[in-house]
Amino acid sequence: HRYFICLGQAYAMTGNEKYAEAFVRILRDWIEHVPLNQESKKVTWREIEAGIRGENWTKSILYFENSSLVDDDFMELFTKSLEEHGEYLFNAKRGFQISSNWGVLENHGLLFIGLALGKEIYTETALKRLEQEVQIQIFSDGVHWEQSCMYHNEVLHCVLETIHMLQAWGRKIPEKITEAARRMAMVNVAWKKPDGCQPLTGDSDETNVEDMLAVSAILLA
């Protein structure tokens, strides 16, 4: 649901209610037709997808807070589903995720949900898990152990967004998380090709990382 943020940005720039209408219609349809069950846990409700939605939903809803289309009825539906996501991620079994980028994406989403809902148990649990995961997954030289530039930068995105959110909420940032972000950002400095893209190693796309470097410089200055 990354495109929900794009809809929000379009709404913020234009004020055109068609973007709010699309957001409400698509999200309502998704919530009503994609329930959490044993089958959906294999596809649309894998923990990694639920974690990614935690970020995208809580970010995108803010763009539409002044739209009349985001009414009490919709917010009740939205909040109930967000609570379901939070409980699902909070109770997720801790297996391979501890040493996988999946775990970071899951608990990064749990952090966003915890802050959005004011659920301290979610927020604190997410931070403890994230701190453990970056210590296990990030080598001393700053490289993510799965040896994929794309996975490296997905994890770095989550770590930077964690720092950003904690700064915005005036909360203490765990030192291990900040240290991991600095090391990972410096890896991007070394990795970046002349065209600004990351190398195509492992399961990687040819993605420009200059925006990631800019965010790193701002947050870690």
Q: Each predicted region: which residue ranges?
A:
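Alpha-solenoid helical repeat scaffolds
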Residues: 6, 13, 33, 63-70, ...
